């Protein structure tokens, strides 16, 4: 059977090769296609075999059935050449310059396979310089998938798209439709006004007549008054039309006196920094409308609003979230272990690393895996992830390790880098000025075999990726673990935890309300305002704190060492300038437990709203100041 299959394949190749030779030698030619006055001799049978359009043409009994020459209108000669080459050689030669014309020809000839290849090529090669052309091309021919994908890309990257020359060539009605939309991902309305003025100036003689209509769609009351004055000085055409002058004068009045009903904000203007309490258990958030057991709590400390995002534990994702980090480009990363179902299908247990898509898809996808360990820290610098220390199983023994592995997101590979100066587990890591700082944790002790096998660490270790080198910096006053850590105004805040004063020599440990603040420039620690009560992080190697707009927030935690204690559902705020803790929210719609607190810039439109019945029941969930 295998021999027959191979024989059929070779038979097909031989047939294709012979037909191609016949075309090149112009043997048995029975039709000539003409496009842009260029002639293409070929065979009706081949055309009809690949194209339903030509099959219908040659079998319908009309004039084309007997004509030797067939003129193709509105199709380029290059696209006909490319498609004929595909028919006769199975090679489709498309590139950025010809893909749209080839796609148009394939659409015209009803060649779905070729059109699909062109469509996928355009999706894969879409960027800010060409997405607008792809969008209007797709709309023109009715390619819904391509139109939807290019529209999403255009709207999401509009700030960058507006700086490219392609957008200056669109029609007035097309620009008008774009700038009417609330869904543009721009943070400042100034960029819309700038685009309108550049578009008009690109061909002022023909486009000035559209200025008033376009200007009405610019939300001028959202623009800085000084920017608007500069625009007037630089574009005298705004002063040559009475309607333009009226629009701008009304805008200045609106800027000075905020309206009762201000203009709608565009999508990008709503993006803000949120506290994300990632991970959850099956209890804690129940609603009569739906179960929120598969969602994670989010909180906007500025507006005091609650949102939810899908949890990485949902479905076939992670069974356990161990820790997480937000990268420099705002990518949200979590690491943990696979679900029991997936583990049963895997040969080995790994660290599973997932990332979140915050626009359009709203789901978690697997990024990579790493050699399994527990109680590790996860850090990031630029576009690299670092799995640091932890506890590994070596020859059936669990040992605390000092190894550090780096994952390059760009290159999709792992590399072992310089190890920690000591073995560590249950430690924390933060990034300041492109350097990693590893804080506290456990380290094994061998000197006193009759005592605890592990000692708490008060060390602060700094890693410089440019040197691949660790340095020990000034130690903390307390040796500790189960604390929270965050960076505020380039300083490291270490909050609460379990620990003891000085180096751990076996002295009594206690729950801490202590705040220690490290200044990297001066390499010194200072004492911060004590927390309202001793507080432990929810996980031994993850933080329950994050910084937003120069303020520090702690989202829940344990008030004691009892692991069965219910989470505190308060959010604490520390303003470094006031040097005082405030409770800014109580009874928040948080799960009974979560895994790691992260801070990322997200848009509320992409998030899940809170259940209305719980908002009604817990009317004070937004808290009090």
Swiss-Prot record:
Kelch repeat locations: 384-434, 435-490, 492-545, 551-601
SUPFAM superfamilies named among the record's database cross-references: Kelch motif (SSF117281), POZ domain (SSF54695)
Keywords: Kelch repeat, Repeat
Start and end residues of each BTB domain: 29-96
InterPro entries found in the cross-reference section: BACK (IPR011705), BTB-kelch_protein (IPR017096), BTB/POZ_dom (IPR000210), Kelch-typ_b-propeller (IPR015915), Kelch_1 (IPR006652), SKP1/BTB/POZ_sf (IPR011333)
Highest taxon of source: Eukaryota
Domain (BACK): residue spans on this chain: 131-233
SMART domains: BACK, BTB, Kelch
One Pfam family of this chain: BTB
Protein's name according to its UniProt entry: Kelch repeat and BTB domain-containing protein 12
Organism: Mus musculus (Mouse)
